[in-house]
Curated annotation (Swiss-Prot):
PANTHER family: GENOME ASSEMBLY, CHROMOSOME: A04, HYDROPHOBIC PROTEIN RCI2 LOW TEMPERATURE AND SALT RESPONSIVE PROTEIN LTI6 -RELATED. The lineage of its organism: Eukaryota, Viridiplantae, Streptophyta, Embryophyta, Tracheophyta. PROSITE patterns: UPF0057. It is found in: Membrane. This is UPF0057 membrane protein At2g24040. Belongs to the UPF0057 (PMP3) family. The keyword Transmembrane applies. Keywords: Membrane, Transmembrane, Transmembrane helix. The chain crosses the membrane at residues 4-24, 33-53. The keyword Iron-sulfur does not apply. It is a multi-pass membrane protein. Pfam families: Pmp3.
Amino acid sequence: MASSCELCCEIFIAILLPPVGVCLRHGCCTVEFFICLILTCLGYLPGIIYAIYAICFLHRDEYFDEYRRPIYYVA
């Protein structure tokens, strides 16, 4: 979990340049980044709203931890 200062800085960057804020949190080649980039190109305000949502509420670490990895059976 990010500290409050780090979160405030990412939100401030997301207000100025939404894709950059999402890139700092989730990486540059992720679905969240491309969604934010498309929304910012379509309209600045939807890009800001999605960037703040992606920074504050989406936690990729919960989805890609060791215990939730899919199990593959080889027959």
